[in-house]
Amino acid sequence: MTKDLTKGKIMPLLVGFTIPLVLGNLFQLTYNAVDSIIVGQFVGKEALAAVGICNPVMTLMILFLNGLCMGASILMGTQFGAKDYNKLQRQISTTMLSGTVFSAILSLCCIIFSRPILKLLQVDPSIMDLTVSYMRIIFLGLIFTFLYNFFSSTLRALGDSQTPLYFLIASSLLNIFGDLFFVIVLKMGSNGCAISTVISEMMCCVFCIIYIQKRVEILRLGRKWLVFDNSLLKKTISYGWVSAMQQATVQLGKIGIQAIVNTMGVSVAAAFAVVNRIDDFAYTPEQNIGHAMTALMAQNKGANEKKRMKEGFKCGMVLEFIYGIILFAVCFILARPLMLLFVKDEEVILHGVKYLRLISFMYILPAATNGIQGYFRGIGDLKITLLSSFINMGVRVITAIPLVLVMGIGIEALPLSYLAGWIGMLIAELPLLIRNYRSIAK
């Protein structure tokens, strides 16, 4: 199923496109969240810290692949909006072939260098072997992660954000039952969670391939998948590497913060890991509204619908701010109940509640930046998103180092560093946004 975003009322289109994105990403986050809940409740805080420490590194690798998919999807959306179906098919096949090879190489490298990477992060020696084992199992499934994200990004570029949701619901249920079986029944600890996650990702990929073979003719596997267009590959890389670097910059900033947190002890590391899980769930809808704006902008740019591009930006920003306000209220009021979902250790809960309530105050700032980045991605100005993300993460780490390591403030310093990063990002983005927005109006 495909959908033309160049026609119809924009606010209902954005809401209708965003809701499946939000639900899909929440189910995807459930993969790792269920791991944390089950490990925290049935194994212990050492295993919970191991899973949490791995998450930023694993996400960094996955984001490199997602960057390729995102860059290609912007081109696909523009080609679909312009009704250039021949170029669209060549774009799809070129991205598929190059991404599969790259993900296989990346998976192998990550497995080999897992221990050196974790040593750089100053992981506590008492949980090093546990963390290495978990990370290596997860990286075995990297190629399945790419294939799913490729197919889902392609479907979204063609206006279909619902179908990927159905695949994720099925695979998330498999992951939950797999976690319960491997951890509680077989007593395999955090490794059992990793095995369950890989199996779930593989099945999600299989479901996606079966669907497109039967229902989406333009994506159906066949000889057309063997087409490799060097000129399109170069353009995809030019979009993809900027998108990948933008996402990688965000994750590298998180890894830098993780390294600082690891100096505070296992309890703080565990609290930080739990809040990061909660923050992922809370922050995802803001990102998804931005992604919906990207899809709408890309198709309407291809169709040269400038008026709809302007209206789409305004509608998207309204949605972002409404959600940011709701998010603050929920996370501040329900901080302790949310922590109790993941862990029983009272020291971990106290650290986590304090941290979560502080960061809840600033969710309105990423609401603004996500909307602005969705706009820039859709019109193809990806270097702006890279620059602003680099400023955000750089300011975060540079601010956190003296606050934590020199002044000894503790976990309370992290929200202050986040605030500084978001403000720096907005200062960088707003002048560029005004200039670009005016150019579209002409």
Language-model regions: role of each:
Residues 1-18, 76-141, 185-241, 297-362, ...:
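Short alpha-helical transmembrane segments in multi-pass integral membrane proteins
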Residues 5-42, 56-71, 75, 100-107, ...:
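N-terminal transmembrane alpha-helices
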Residues 16-35, 137, 148, 171, ...:
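Transmembrane helical elements of multi-pass membrane transporters/channels
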Residues 26, 30-49, 118-125, 181-188, ...:
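Helix-terminus/linker motif at the lipid-water interface of multi-pass membrane proteins
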Residues 45-56, 135, 194, 266-281, ...:
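Small-residue hotspots at the loop-to-helix junctions and early N-terminal turns
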Residues 48-108, 145-164, 271-335, 366-380, ...:
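Small-residue-rich hydrophobic transmembrane alpha-helices
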Residues 60-63, 175-180, 204-209, 281-284, ...:
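Hydrophobic transmembrane alpha-helices of multi-pass small-molecule transporters
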Residues 69, 137-156, 164-172, 193-208, ...:
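Short runs within selected transmembrane alpha-helices of multi-pass transporters and secretion channels
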